[in-house]
Amino acid sequence: IGNPATRDEWLQRCRTLVAALADRTGAEDQVVYIQVTRGVAPRDHAMPPDAVPTVFMMVNPMRPPTAEQRHHGVACVSARDFRWERADIKSTSLLGNVLARQLSVDHGAAETILFRDGFLTEASSSNVWVVHEGALLGPPKSERLLEGIRVELLRELCEEVGIAYNLRPIPEADVRSADELLLSSATKEVLAVTRLDGEAVGH
């Protein structure tokens, strides 16, 4: 899909949307959602060569974790990662993520942590981090997970304060025996997981 706008045009569109919502709601912190599709064409699985990309944009007030969630952490459940093999592609084909997220909702949990072939991948809409012996560990970049916007930020913060940071394959057993578990995402920021499948995390 060709980029339908220049960098300056994207920025201007975002500023216009954010300003409009701020005027209506007074919300200072907002989430901008941008969806680009290939465009309008007769229904076919083949990609139309001459379609003009369609752009949809919206903004919503940012809803960060509550004070209680920050203080006490959240509960998660786990599941087998049954999604397709290209989870690194950010697309609107999110049925696997939707089903995983619904599993956590059905159990009164904040997220569903996913495992494939015995190793941690990610959660339904978050990256997952393991704290072990003072080091922050995350799964390596691969086709099995989508790299979130907090990944590089966490690396930088670890470097600043001298915490070891390592991306490597993480067996499920290491997740369940972790000293701490964390979620990160654009809207969750960095959030502690204090229970996994009903069991307390860490000490």
Show where each model-derived region lies.
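Conserved alpha/beta cores of soluble small-molecule-handling proteins
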Residues: I1-E111, D117-F119, S142, V151, ...
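Glycine- and Gly-Pro-enriched alpha-helical subdomains that act as flexible
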Residues: F115-K141, L145-E147
